[in-house]
Amino acid sequence: MNDNDVSSYYKEALATDSFTVHNNFLNMLLKNGSALGMERHYCYFKDSKNADLKRILGNGFLKRGKEGVLFLEEKLKTETDALAKSNVIHLIGLSYNKEYLPYILPYLDDADNEIRYKAIIACGWLGDAEAIKILKEHYATEKDALLRGFIVSAMRQIFFRHKETKQQIVDFIYVKMPEETYNELLAIMIVVLQDLTKVKFGLKEDSCSGEISGDIAKAKDKVLKKIKK
């Protein structure tokens, strides 16, 4: 199939929400495992303004196995667009393979907030108890309060796979919460505590949207009283 045919199928895929059309286009790209074929795949992924198609094309790199992830790792070194780089970090995180965590760690200190956000989340998907230590260290230097909240959320993701991390996460939150004042960060800390300890402090987290509701001040007060016991 020549370049014009692929381009034509891409335009067709862009113009529809059909999963079948999107998946067929991905399968067409996956037939070419050469460096040029993966580069073409990446260009279409990066270019797509169709969110459904973009998601399918992104996940397609994981279908390429280790070669696909290694290609993405090389893209992290050369990609100059911050949003595109953050999307690549996200995809590597979705591999859920600890082997690829070292690719992500340098971006915890990136100047761009979106890149740091995706790196934090990816650490939660890829990491284990050792990654908890890394996230604790990053928490101390992260100036964005909401991103500090996502660090705590990433710790919870690690807990879901590694239950032995529970106490060190709980202890960390107990130490850090009294000094925090940003409501969104406090809300994340509290719902994570609720998940890990099974103690209800008065907040609810929507399982679909992640939106947190409830009286944060009252919930924080309940946590602080528990800490002082």
Task: Name each model feature, range by range.
Residues 114, 132, 168-173, 205-216:
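HEAT/HEAT-like alpha-solenoid repeats
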Residues 1, 11-12, 19-33, 43-44, ...:
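Structural detector for internal amphipathic alpha-helices that build alpha-solenoid repeat scaffolds
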Residues 9-10, 40-42, 71-73, 103-105, ...:
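Buried hydrophobic core positions in alpha-solenoid tandem helical repeats
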Residues 17-18, 49-50, 80-81, 111-112, ...:
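Short inter-helical turns and helix N-cap capping residues of alpha-solenoid HEAT/ARM repeat scaffolds
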Residues 194-229:
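Eukaryotic acidic, Ser/Thr-rich intrinsically disordered low-complexity regions
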